[in-house]
């Protein structure tokens, strides 16, 4: 019975939605991994007595401090305070793993967790199951926070974007760290889909944030909104394809896959609708920047329809209207498909707000087409090309290269041409691609390209995530036309290093590394002056001894006196995982 209730609750797309949002397409949250009550105080006390030769009852408060967060995490509220509580419990589990892991064994405590998708109970005598489940619940809680945010305010939408991105980060960390989990909802294949789903919903939130102030009937604004909508439709299409893979198709909730398909068609339809509006309502007026408009229109498509050019289309009212009506025709087709897909899923049919949004968008496109419809449209309509997906919410680049501890020079633009099909340089590496060797007489070298440069864009096309073959294909596609390639290069690390005395002399705030250096110096001095008394195994981390011991393994000596008072163990935040963090 509990299994069926968990499955029905956690796979519902209607749960955790903000009831005050009257006209918002629902999002997909994750349910928490439920558990059972566990009392491991007796087991830990026995272990302390057996291994450390100390009375376990002296540490009742500390053991209670470990058990209380676990109980509180079972029913967390949807706010940042509960996320902090989950992370506190996760970190305490890391310390417990170090304290009580003996060789290849640990205290025999059974941990129980239910699969969040199908409700199957998993039980193991392994603390790593508990740690992995806490991480999963942290990511799930972030999804519920993102779903619950107020979408009628910019701050609420930004909070939703942040929450979904944090959820994706936590789940991706879980996938890379805990590689052999017994629960299917934490398998690498399922976590990959969940990460993609969170990033997709973050992208949807970006579109809603752009649209919230209102969409002006202005050329450049409509181009931006159309491409953002196309981006959302594209990522939802990719998500639906990922959900249809053999490894996850049988276990992914049908309502999730259906909603991904519905949104893929819905946002693709919006992209065609906004493109149609910018074409039909556009008027060439004196003083307009036609060059900029021509460039934007050319970048809106992979290719223009046969017989049309961007500039001629902008100047010709008839061509613009015909192309705009073609986009409306495609928009209505996608709207019809989104409504049909939503009607096939029982859970989606029951979500009234979703049906209203889909029908309203479909009716708007139909009315717009009816206003400009002519008798011979079916004979004269051309096939409207797909809108190129583009967004302002692009990732910075691969983390292996673009990270804060590397110093970068400002981006440089190099303009050059390929002479007789020869670029004059070679490429290497994965994403991002690096310029390796340049011919001494090639035009790229004359334009300013250097060996070791990383290619970030070519003709405004983002290349930070492209492979060598993809970048080479893009470069050769321009033939002998001029190519604008933007590159960045690493700053010489030796030129930006500052010694310790120079930093202190100007009164700068001490960094973490400097504090560690200072502590190390103090420790060396203390060792020559006196020998500190050995500490009991649970006394690490107290304010009195925080700088005297940098280890969590301060075990009692054989001759150490038994402590007479109970010692309070604080909640340290420096240990995220142990070396044995994978199954």
UniProtKB/Swiss-Prot annotation:
Q: Which CDD domains match?
A: PDZ_rhophilin-like (cd06712)
Q: Which InterPro entries match?
A: BRO1_dom (IPR004328), BRO1_sf (IPR038499), PDZ (IPR001478), PDZ_sf (IPR036034), RHPN1_2 (IPR047138)
What transmembrane ranges does the database entry give?
none
Q: Name one Pfam family in it.
A: BRO1
Q: Which SUPFAM superfamilies is this protein grouped with?
A: PDZ domain-like (SSF50156)
User: Which superkingdom heads the taxonomic lineage of this protein's source?
Assistant: Eukaryota
The protein's matches in PROSITE patterns, at most eight in alphabetical order, are given as: BRO1
Q: Where is the PDZ domain?
A: 412-490
Q: Where is the BRO1 domain?
A: 26-375
- Name the GO terms of the biological process aspect: negative regulation of stress fiber assembly
PANTHER family in the cross-refs? RHOPHILIN, RHOPHILIN-2-RELATED
Q: What is this protein called?
A: Putative rhophilin-2-like protein RHPN2P1
Q: Which organism is it from?
A: Homo sapiens (Human)
Q: Lineage in the entry?
A: Eukaryota, Metazoa, Chordata, Craniata, Vertebrata
């Amino acid at each position: 019975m509990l299994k069926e209730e968990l499955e029905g609750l956690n796979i519902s797309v209607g749960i955790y939605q903000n009831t005050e949002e009257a006209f918002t397409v629902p999002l997909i949250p994750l349910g928490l991994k439920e558990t059972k009550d566990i009392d491991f105080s007796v087991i830990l006390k026995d272990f302390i007595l057996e291994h450390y030769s100390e009375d376990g009852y002296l540490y009742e408060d500390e053991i209670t401090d470990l058990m209380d967060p676990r109980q509180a995490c079972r029913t967390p509220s949807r706010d940042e305070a509960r996320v902090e509580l989950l992370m506190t419990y996760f970190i305490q589990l890391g310390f417990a793993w170090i304290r009580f892991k003996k060789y290849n064994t640990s205290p025999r405590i059974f941990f129980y967790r239910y699969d969040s998708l199908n409700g199957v109970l998993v039980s193991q005598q392994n603390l790593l199951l508990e740690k992995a489940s806490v991480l999963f619940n942290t990511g799930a809680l972030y999804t519920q926070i993102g779903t619950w945010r107020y979408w009628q305010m910019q701050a609420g939408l930004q909070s939703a974007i942040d929450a979904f991105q944090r959820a994706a980060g936590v789940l991706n960390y879980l996938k890379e760290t805990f590689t052999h989990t017994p629960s299917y909802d934490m398998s690498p294949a399922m976590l990959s889909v969940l990460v993609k789903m969170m990033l997709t919903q973050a992208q949807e939130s970006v579109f809603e944030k752009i649209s919230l102030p209102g969409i002006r009937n202005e050329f450049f604004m409509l181009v931006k909104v159309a491409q953002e909508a196309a981006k959302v439709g594209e990522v939802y299409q990719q998500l639906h394809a990922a959900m249809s893979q053999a490894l996850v198709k049988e276990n992914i909730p049908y309502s999730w896959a259906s909603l991904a398909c519905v949104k893929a068609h819905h946002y693709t339809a919006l992209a065609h609708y906004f493109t149609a509006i910018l074409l039909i309502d556009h008027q060439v007026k004196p003083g307009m920047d036609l060059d900029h408009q021509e460039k934007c229109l050319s970048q809106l498509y992979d290719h223009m329809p046969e017989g049309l050019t961007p500039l001629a289309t902008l100047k010709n009212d008839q061509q613009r209207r015909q192309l705009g009506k073609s986009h409306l025709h495609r928009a209505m087709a996608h709207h019809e498909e989104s409504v049909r897909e939503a009607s096939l899923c029982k859970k989606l049919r029951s979500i009234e707000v979703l049906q209203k949004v889909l029908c309203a968008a479909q009716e708007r496109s139909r009315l717009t087409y009816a206003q400009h419809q002519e008798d011979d449209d079916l004979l004269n309509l051309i096939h409207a090309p797909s809108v190129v997906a583009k967004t302002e919410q692009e990732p910075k680049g691969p983390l292996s290269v673009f990270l804060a501890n590397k110093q970068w020079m400002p981006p440089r633009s190099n303009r050059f041409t390929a002479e007789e099909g020869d670029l004059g340089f070679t490429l290497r590496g994965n994403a991002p691609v690096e310029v390796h060797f340049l011919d001494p007489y090639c035009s790229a070298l004359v334009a300013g390209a250097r060996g070791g440069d990383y290619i970030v864009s070519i003709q405004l096309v983002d290349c930070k995530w492209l492979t060598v073959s993809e970048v080479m294909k893009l470069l050769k596609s321009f033939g002998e036309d001029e190519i604008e390639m933007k590159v960045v290069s690493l700053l010489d690390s030796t030129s930006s290093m500052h010694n310790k005395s120079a930093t202190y002399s100007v009164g700068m705030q001490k960094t973490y590394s400097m504090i560690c250096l200072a502590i190390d110096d103090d420790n060396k001095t203390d060792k020559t002056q006196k020998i500190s008394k050995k500490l009991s195994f649970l006394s690490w981390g107290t304010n009195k001894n925080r700088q005297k011991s940098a280890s969590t393994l301060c075990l009692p000596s054989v001759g150490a006196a038994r402590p007479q008072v109970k010692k309070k163990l604080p909640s340290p935040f420096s240990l995220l995982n142990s070396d044995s963090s994978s199954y």
